[in-house]
Amino acid sequence: MDPNTIIEALRGTMDPALREAAERQLNEAHKSLNFVSTLLQITMSEQLDLPVRQAGVIYLKNMITQYWPDREATPGDIAPYTIPEEDRHCIRENIVEAIIHSPELIRVQLTTCIHHIIKHDYPSRWTAIVDKIGFYLQSDNSACWLGILLCLYQLVKNYEYKKPEERSPLVAAMQHFLPVLKDRFIQLLSDQSDQSVLIQKQIFKIFYALVQYTLPLELINQQNLTEWVEILKTVVNRDVPNETLQVEEDDRPELPWWKCKKWALHILARLFERYGSPGNVSKEYNEFAEVFLKAFAVGVQQVLLKVLYQYKEKQYMAPRVLQQTLNYINQGVSHALTWKNLKPHIQGIIQDVIFPLMCYTDADEELWQEDPYEYIRMKFDVFEDFISPTTAAQTLLFTACSKRKEVLQKTMGFCYQILTEPNADPRKKDGALHMIGSLAEILLKKKIYKDQMEYMLQNHVFPLFSSELGYMRARACWVLHYFCEVKFKSDQNLQTALELTRRCLIDDREMPVKVEAAIALQVLISNQEKAKEYITPFIRPVMQALLHIIRETENDDLTNVIQKMICEYSEEVTPIAVEMTQHLAMTFNQVIQTGPDEEGSDDKAVTAMGILNTIDTLLSVVEDHKEITQQLEGICLQVIGTVLQQHVLEFYEEIFSLAHSLTCQQVSPQMWQLLPLVFEVFQQDGFDYFTDMMPLLHNYVTVDTDTLLSDTKYLEMIYSMCKKVLTGVAGEDAECHAAKLLEVIILQCKGRGIDQCIPLFVEAALERLTREVKTSELRTMCLQVAIAALYYNPHLLLNTLENLRFPNNVEPVTNHFITQWLNDVDCFLGLHDRKMCVLGLCALIDMEQIPQVLNQVSGQILPAFILLFNGLKRAYACHAEHENDSDDDEDAEDDDETEELGSDEDDIDEDGQEYLEILAKQAGEDGDDEDWEEDDAEETALEGYSTIIDDEDNPVDEYQIFKAIFQTIQNRNPVWYQALTHGLNEEQRKQLQDIATLADQRRAAHESKMIEKHGGYKFSAPVVPSSFNFGGPAPGMN
């Protein structure tokens, strides 16, 4: 492969006029031998200009991520392309050196490459990577250290989330590397250069990835942990050079000095929280936890108290450094040893560290004024919470006040002092209220405080709604949100809270205030019984305001608010549902205009999903109002059409849910017109969304069967989709759904003349069983398609089976099907599947001409019936139990005060520890099925797709059908009856009698229910025959 040709093509990709031809040239060449090796050579060549090398490394990265691993060919297809072994060998030989010697822009792409190579090749094909890393780590040439550490980091990252037993190749390698890393670090500590600190940071990142989820105790013992903890403390404690203060404050966290401190604290906080807290760790870490707490926890805490002191003294502190420091201190509150050391400082920390962090800041004000929408996004960003020092401060405050005596009392005293101080700085008032609101959960459980909270709201929060300062009005709403469960003694105070919040929502001129008001109003309505009635007259302007704010802010929290409000005010919302849906549809279209690569597109996607879910909620609220539903249908179809026609895959799930909601009561002609579009989308890019389409397809089949059968194209499309799923690579869950849909069609159309479809459906399902099946669910579901066909028409099914021929299968399909079915009868779970089995077996044994294979397995048939009926009895019992369970699962109100600990007590999470042990135990052993409720208590995942035989008013009763057929066989075909019963033992005969008894009871109960339903009387207890003499017709088998 000529490198110059590739170089010119890469250069061409940067020229808009040449790009298309250049990319075509590269795509034509990329499967050639040595192409990938040549790309790496180009990437490493210092003689070439950087843009060409960058283009080369990006193409190389794409090649490696796509084509490195071996891939199996699907049956009948040619083997897919993978990078030739000759090229792979060349890459493995040279990529480490490439990473070491490349500039940063190239190196970052190469580290992605080596990550993928290690993932697929280590240790089986590339043990040499360990030797290379060892060689360069031992080298005295410090210029190669950062590059080789990046390689080692990718090795460790590949094992970061693996179970301990899967990490042995990493542990073996780290036995050699960890001591070298420690020695290198100690050597670097005296070097004050940025490069030295960058290398230190990289070593910490390796250490963190090594211990984040599993602590390898064979690598880390008390001796080397002592050395590592000393290194970590040294880094946290050392001063950052003064010249860093010349850098803009927003840019300082990116400096290696602060990043190094951040990773040191990350490690310390992780070690303490996950492995070093006695009473809160799984048992394998018990000894380590005791050692860590006694030998290291207090010493580290002393260093971290110094960090907090520096922050108090107004020295600059990177936000993540402060956050991780507070996380470590928070962990220490729970242990007597660390608490004893922390206790003298806690009030100072609360007043001088936590309080300032919880006050409104200059940065907040700047953002509020310059970009209030970004301010809202930041305040509601859950990912921001994970890294925010304010959130860490809030957590520490809550832990200290809930777990340690006197802390809450002193904190509340401090806050009240600020709130009652005349002419107090409003920002300080904001901080005090922020602290009080953060403690709401504790305060509302403490007898001494909970009765005072209403007065606190009345005296210190209500007046803030008149403040000139927007952030104070927002804080007032926020506090009401957090105290929404206050027991108002005065109805007037509750009304005032609602009225002030409502006015903020509707009339306030500042958007962050409106957002806080919206959330506060909704939680007050949900938690205060009398609130709903008060807001009812204002529901239209409230809903309009919410819709407006959602459109303006595109905030996902508000879509949750409006959904809850719709459910609270379903009657009041119904008249304005069309207007609301139009507004939501317009907002949805606005939100999805954002391109996938634009900033904030992920947030917008979540908001768009929330909007679609809100429309779905509106549909459910108005489902009994046919004329409104029809109007909503037109609006929804526009939204559905937009998503499907523009192929916006990320909303397919919600769109199909919306379409399902529109077809639950009836399927309009417009909704039938949607089916061809759904089919087209499935064929193009919707293959992976079949399970999301399933509820809609189920409605097409069951809600409007007449139209389904009026035009053959409808059934053809649905069958074609199921067939494609069953023959493709959709995975077993989707295949189960496809088989289920075929079963539903067969049952729904019994007696409706789809005989010509049955062979196609059965072949599609049974052909799937000729290939590997991993789950019993798929095996039974495919069998169930044939069982349904048996119920539909036994002769048609047997003729179909006789005519089926599968490759590599000599045995007649009829024999194989029946044998497999009887062998797997214990795998049919839930109500529907067992009922289907019973009905299928009934149809089979009731045939006038008994298939030959049945004579061979006659002794298995009644035991199979008994097994199924036993399962059905349990399933019905569980179903009835769940029906009778109260829907109200709310916990009784908990007035228990949070238990505070004495200074010499540890907070031991016994439940959490027990839970960790259970998880560990479950991970190591398979569960057994001794407790039948596991299988019977819940309906199977596919049972939610009801069929015509599952309708409670449908007279298809499997008990009565079995009893009638069995009695018929006894009278009509004594030889067959004898063949079925001769092997039964006494217990089995008794169980058959019990089934007959239950059949009569169910018949009497059904008749009683029918008479009662039509205004008649209830039967008394039915008279049940005591002998094995069956009689009466069998409903449902005609």
Swiss-Prot record:
Residues 881-910 are annotated as: Disordered. The modification Phosphoserine is found at residues 886, 903, 1020. GO terms for cellular component: cytoplasm; cytosol; nucleoplasm; nucleus. Residues 884-910 have a biased composition (Acidic residues). Signal peptide: none annotated. InterPro entries: ARM-like, ARM-type_fold, Importin-beta_N, XPO2_central. The modification Phosphothreonine is found at residue 898. GO terms for molecular function: histone binding; SMAD binding; small GTPase binding. Pfam families: Cse1 (PF08506), IBN_N (PF03810). SUPFAM superfamilies: ARM repeat. Keywords: Acetylation, Cytoplasm, Nucleus, Phosphoprotein, Protein transport, Transport. GO terms for biological process: innate immune response; negative regulation of osteoblast differentiation; positive regulation of odontoblast differentiation; positive regulation of protein localization to nucleus; protein import into nucleus. The keyword Transport applies. Coiled coil: none annotated. Gene3D superfamilies: Leucine-rich Repeat Variant. Residues 22-101 form the Importin N-terminal domain. Induction: Induced by odontoblastic differentiation in dental papilla cells. It is found in: Cytoplasm; Nucleus. The modification N-acetylmethionine is found at residue 1. Belongs to the importin beta family. Forms a heterodimer with KPNB1. Interacts with histone H1. Interacts with H2A, H2B, H3 and H4 histones. Interacts with SNUPN and XPO1. Interacts with RPS7 and RPL5. Interacts with RPL23A (via BIB domain). Binds directly to nuclear pore complexes. Interacts with SMAD4 and NUP93; translocates SMAD4 to the nucleus through the NPC upon BMP7 stimulation resulting in activation of SMAD4 signaling. Interacts with phosphorylated SMAD2; the interaction facilitates translocation of SMAD2 to the nucleus. Interacts with SRP19. Functions in nuclear protein import, either by acting as autonomous nuclear transport receptor or as an adapter-like protein in association with the importin-beta subunit KPNB1. Acting autonomously is thought to serve itself as receptor for nuclear localization signals (NLS) and to promote translocation of import substrates through the nuclear pore complex (NPC) by an energy requiring, Ran-dependent mechanism. This is Importin-7. The gene is Ipo7.
